[in-house]
């Protein structure tokens, strides 16, 4: 459950810290839909598979790996890797990648300032991000790779030899 709680806390944190960045939205001809909005934040997958380009702009949070370790004479530690996939749209070949970079740098700045999310998940380094150079305009994609230390599960069984 802990990685799911991390995703929930990250979703709230990112929504709160990016809500003022309005991004271009692709509109269908003849519709009266919004032309700008903040990126929507999703966990593990987009809600409608057939309409992925209509979801843009978005930030998709995905747990990639998790591990619990205990080195000799050390307390247990847990770690989860989370990938944040960011997609933006723009007809302007300069503004699209800049909007993408702006979102990535905002998330980077706010996460590194706060460092702890939900009172229990600690950001670890390295903090990595990439802007994909081979994306097809008018869609621009990038991602952030993060590592988080997470609480571990403790044994509930009492030691018999005590």
Which residues make up each language-model segment?
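Generic internal hydrophobic packing segments that stabilize the cores of diverse globular domains
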Residues: 58, 81, 100-104
